Amino acid sequence: MTLNSLLLEQKCPKILVLGAGISGKACAIWLSTFDCDIDLVDSRKIELKKNLPSNITFFPSCIFAKINLKKYHGVVVSPGLSPHEKSVNNFFIINKLASDHGIPIWTEVDLFFSALEMKANKTTVESKIIAVTGTNGKTTVVSMVKDLLKNLGYDVELAGNVGTSLLEALMERMQNGKFPAFWVLELSSFQLFLSSDFKSDVSVILNFSSDHLDWHSSE
């Protein structure tokens, strides 16, 4: 189930956001703009510097294995959490329980694409997505693509694994009331691994080599 489908079918859905880093906080704040009840959790003992909207509850020092997943309609996962690491403070247990109970799992990439789909249904102006991934060279390539398009006179937004997170860039554009002609996205393997509802107009895969094996667990 996509986020858009859930928002249509369920009144005030309860959503769990795992990880309170840059991506996790952006996801929680984006979801707070809808009629959602959000629990933002992190295994670390941290304090958030910014005040959160009233429909977000933050739980630091959380043991993921003790979360009652059945009360949630959906789970959003931060890219730093590996689905392979089998500790009580990681995502393996949540991934298995969500699968067992049919609870959808989304990433920031999925939420970003859902937001663009919602906008596309309300306007005739459609932004194109250029997504770049690979082991090496992503930042160089997205910077070149951005500069090429800007030199051709297009409004371009660079986001993702470089500079501004996807949803932070999206919310800033919404505030300004102007969407770009092109979104140029740098996406890591972490961001794409669990994404299930993302489509780009142009996809670029640069290269693959052994890297981040602590996250991927094997080659």
Predicted stretch roles:
Residues 23, 46, 190:
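Conserved Rossmann-like nucleotide-cofactor binding loop
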Residues 36-51:
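NAD(P)-binding Rossmann-fold cofactor-contacting core
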Residues 53-67:
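Glycine-rich, highly charged phosphate/nucleotide-binding loops
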